[in-house]
């Protein structure tokens, strides 16, 4: 109970109530008194009351703007047995407390409503629109807008440019018109009213300029006629880079130069039609709306020698008793840059190569051959890269003086023909005998049935009650046609369908309520094995609609092609017994270093904690933002963006993964609201929590929470707040607090991602631009580049990422401990996610044994193995750090 007001107020109300009851002894149910207006200063206490008569022990409900007030600061005072006064106390009044209040009571189906009490909250001005960060061209006009509200009114706006006030006051809203600037400038505004002054955020206006020259120009995959050029763009000077120009200079004979324009990203291009065995030089420049950057430095490379694509022409042969003379049309040694060294002559007898001869002239003399047998000869042109296409076979008969060109394999041997005819005849005879025997076969009722049929009598009919097949249940063929999905989805998945015989399932990497992720070895076209991750739905909890939804999201992933978005390798179907739907599986790249959340967590609380530089964290943010920018450009809504769903690639770049699939696989961070599906509540935007609405703006909200996770190195957002309380917590105006050591610019960016109105949140394009600007300034200030080294030593396998990372960030040997020779372990009993790292998973030994077992069993596991998988979920997982 709280004190509802001064004793004099209570006494006066009691006296008024007593006087009313004395005037009329018969009291009808109803509220007495009149409504009134109340003005309260922000931060002070307000006390409201209403008086009800005509009911014993009433239930009086306070309402604000039609919504029941859930507050413990309410108190009842009885005047007599059927006359009561209710008090409502509002402590530390804020602007959301302003509104219309009244009381309601119900008795015998009749509702009574009091007059309204209007509460107005006065305080310092509140900004509804603040200046925003901009990037502008030099000396171009632009506007800045600032708006604030009271009460009390009126209020005025003052503008500041840097640390200097403009001195002119304007009413709200105020639009500041700037004719143009030439350098980076800060703008802010102040709002004044009778209660005080409020200051807006500081908006930074950057001046666009020419981009910096590209760097890290690299030449790879060089052949005789092609080469791949990749590069890193320089700082874009606050204007998006749209295209790059690659200049190629050839030093073949005379200097030849040509340029090639390509759109970006990706920052890579394949050069073709290059001269073989030639020195080339390459340089790159990139262009934004302000113009082109300076060129990068020249990078020199040599194309490889190309196999000649020429065939010897006009081959002639002269046969004598002791030798065979060959000659053909000569070829220029330097023709088309092939650097021809000579000719290779090969001869065969009875379909077996008898010898080879290399000559530099356009003639050859063969002496080592059997003149009693047919001889076939062919010739090719050769250089250091190899032998070109062979000429047609030249046939020299055993008694001919000169040959004529024909292919030796066109001769048809009579032996295979006879064998084929005999095989066909035997097959036809066997099939005829089988059908005849089957037609004459009768049951023990055959004679009786035959006589009845002859007389036109009734025929005995029966149906088998059950099958006594000893071979076990028949396996249903797993095809796209057998799972009941739409034709449109079939056509999308047809070219990425992988047969289940092409890969072998290994150990389980993670399990959840709706499915699991398993390691696997995929057999490639060149017979090599590639390690992949396989996601599959749990066998007993899905129907055909679940399969279609699962595979439809996989079809979306098929179209993705971006370095920061996890790309689909393929889909597969696991066969099951007839009558049961196949298990759908999605095949994804195996990310050696696991998910970003575990990496950040281990860097903070692992056995060897490391301090991640802010440049590295911002680089992670840029990677995620680039991936989300790409997804939003494809009109794809992620719905579950978080560090746990961002994977670390082998080169430590971040890839956005789990495109909506994770919402039905993992359940640890999800909350079921009523009977709806489980949701990642602490990452959801307000509109998603309230109306189940998902847009690119709700992904921006989740991106803000993801930034907070990265800055805090994997801490849980809204710690101490229950999932069921998140909506009330956010609607009350609360947000995640600024973490220690967090840049003000980063936290301002997070807060803008959490604006209540979705359309006022920044886009991923704008967020990426601002993050790149922050990273550019940090890179300039830093004395060293932000490189991330991962120690992949054999002691701990791929799992030595933490110790390697720890060493990489130490600048002096005297201040760094040497790498640990042993691996610590940390037992994690809860459900972990794909793929836990940094931490040692002992991939080498465990997988080899797992793969061998998989080879023996094949892909398909029998039904009893599903129970073993359930038991594995209960076991403790040991992660080596």
From Swiss-Prot:
Disulfide bonds join 50-103, 146-189. Residues 29-414 are extracellular. Tyrosine phosphorylated upon receptor stimulation. It holds the Pfam family I-set. GO terms for biological process: cell adhesion. The active site is at 640 (proton acceptor). Residues 436-881 are cytoplasmic. GO terms for cellular component: plasma membrane. Glycans are attached at residues 37, 49, 143, 216, 279, 351, 365. It is an enzyme of class 2 (transferase). May be involved in cell adhesion processes, particularly in the central nervous system. Belongs to the protein kinase superfamily. Tyr protein kinase family. AXL/UFO subfamily. This is Tyrosine-protein kinase receptor TYRO3. It comes from Xenopus tropicalis (Western clawed frog).
């Amino acid at each position: 109970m709280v004190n509802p007001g001064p004793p004099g107020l209570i006494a006066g109300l009691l006296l008024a109530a007593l006087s009313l009851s004395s005037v009329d002894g018969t009291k009808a149910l109803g509220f007495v008194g009149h409504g009134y207006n109340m003005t309260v200063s922000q931060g002070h206490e307000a006390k409201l009351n209403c008086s009800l008569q005509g009911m014993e022990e009433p239930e009086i409900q306070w309402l604000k703007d039609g919504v029941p007030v859930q507050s413990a600061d309410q108190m009842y005072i009885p005047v007599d047995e059927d006359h009561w006064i209710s008090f409502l106390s509002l402590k530390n009044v804020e602007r959301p407390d302003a509104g219309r209040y009244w009381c309601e009571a119900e008795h015998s189906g009749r509702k009574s409503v009091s007059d309204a009490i209007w509460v107005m909250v006065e305080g310092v001005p509140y900004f509804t629109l603040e200046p925003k960060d901009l990037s502008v061209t030099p000396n171009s006009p632009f506007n800045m807008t600032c708006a604030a509200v009271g009460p009390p009114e009126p209020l005025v706006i003052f503008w500041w440019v840097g640390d200097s006030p403009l001195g002119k006051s304007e009413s709200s809203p105020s639009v500041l018109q700037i004719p143009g600037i030439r350098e980076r400038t800060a703008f802010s505004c102040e709002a004044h009213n009778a209660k005080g002054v409020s200051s807006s955020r500081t908006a930074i206006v950057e001046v666009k300029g020419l981009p910096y020259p590209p760097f890290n120009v690299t030449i790879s995959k060089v052949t005789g006629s092609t080469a791949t050029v990749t590069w890193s763009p320089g700082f874009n000077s606050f204007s998006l880079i749209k295209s790059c120009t690659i200049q190629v200079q050839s030093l073949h004979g005379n200097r030849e130069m040509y340029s090639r324009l390509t759109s970006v990203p990706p920052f890579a291009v394949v050069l073709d039609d290059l001269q073989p065995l030639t020195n080339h030089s390459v340089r790159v420049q990139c262009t934004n709306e302000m113009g082109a950057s300076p060129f990068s430095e020249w990078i020199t490379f040599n194309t490889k020698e190309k196999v000649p694509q020429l065939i010897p022409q006009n081959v002639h042969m002269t046969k004598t008793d002791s030798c065979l003379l060959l000659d053909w049309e000569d070829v220029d040694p330097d023709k088309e840059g092939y650097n021809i060294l000579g000719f290779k002559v090969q001869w065969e007898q009875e379909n077996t190569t008898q010898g080879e001869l290399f000559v530099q002239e356009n003639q050859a003399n063969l002496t080592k051959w059997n003149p009693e047998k047919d001889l076939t000869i062919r010739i090719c042109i050769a250089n250091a890269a190899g032998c070109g296409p062979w000429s047609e076979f030249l046939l020299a008969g055993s008694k001919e003086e000169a040959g004529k060109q024909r292919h030796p394999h066109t001769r048809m041997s009579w032996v295979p023909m006879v064998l084929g005819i005999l095989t066909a005849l035997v097959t036809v005879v066997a099939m005829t005998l089988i059908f005849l025997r089957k037609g004459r076969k009768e049951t023990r009722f055959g004679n009786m049935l035959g006589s009845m049929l002859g007389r036109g009598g009734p025929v005995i009919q029966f149906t088998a009650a059950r099958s006594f097949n000893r071979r076990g249940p028949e396996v249903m063929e797993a095809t796209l046609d057998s799972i009941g999905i739409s034709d449109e989805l079939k056509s999308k998945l047809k070219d990425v369908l992988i047969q289940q015989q092409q890969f072998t399932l290994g150990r389980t990497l993670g399990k959840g309520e709706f499915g699991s992720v398993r390691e696997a070895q995929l057999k490639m076209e060149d017979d090599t094995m590639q390690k992949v991750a396989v996601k599959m739905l749990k066998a007993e909890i899905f129907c055909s609609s679940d399969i279609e939804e699962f595979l439809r999201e996989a079809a979306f992933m098929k179209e993705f092609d971006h370095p920061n978005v996890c790309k689909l390798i393929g889909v597969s179907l696991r066969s099951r017994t007839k009558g049961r739907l196949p298990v759908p599986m999605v095949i994804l790249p195996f990310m050696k270093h696991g998910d970003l959340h575990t990496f950040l967590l281990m860097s903070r609380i692992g056995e060897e904690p490391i301090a991640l530089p802010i440049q590295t964290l911002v680089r992670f943010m840029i990677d995620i933002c680039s991936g989300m920018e790409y997804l939003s450009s494809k009109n794809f809504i992620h719905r579950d963006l978080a560090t746990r769903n961002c994977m670390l690639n082998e080169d430590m770049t971040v890839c956005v993964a789990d495109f909506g699939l994770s919402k039905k696989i993992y359940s640890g961070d999800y909350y079921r609201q009523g009977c709806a599906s489980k949701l990642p509540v602490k990452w959801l935007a307000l509109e998603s929590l309230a109306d189940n609405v998902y847009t690119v703006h709700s992904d921006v909200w989740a991106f803000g929470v993801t930034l907070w996770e990265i800055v805090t190195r994997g801490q849980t957002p809204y710690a101490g707040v229950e999932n069921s309380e998140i909506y009330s917590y956010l609607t009350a105006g609360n947000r995640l607090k600024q973490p220690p050591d967090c840049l003000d610019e980063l936290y301002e960016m997070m807060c803008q991602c959490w604006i209540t109105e979705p359309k006022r949140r920044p886009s991923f394009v704008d967020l990426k631009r601002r993050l790149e600007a922050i990273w550019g300034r940090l890179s300039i200030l830093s004395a060293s580049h932000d490189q991330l080294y991962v120690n992949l030593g054999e002691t701990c396998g791929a799992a030595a990422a933490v110790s390697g990372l720890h060493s990489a960030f130490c600048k002096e040997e005297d201040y760094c401990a040497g790498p640990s020779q042993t691996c610590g372990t940390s037992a994690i009993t809860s459900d972990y996610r794909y793929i836990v790292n940094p931490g040692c998973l002992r991939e080498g030994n465990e997988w080899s044994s797992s793969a061998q077992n998989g080879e023996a069993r094949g892909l398909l596991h029998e039904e009893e193995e599903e129970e073993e998988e359930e038991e594995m979920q209960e076991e403790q997982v040991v992660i080596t750090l």
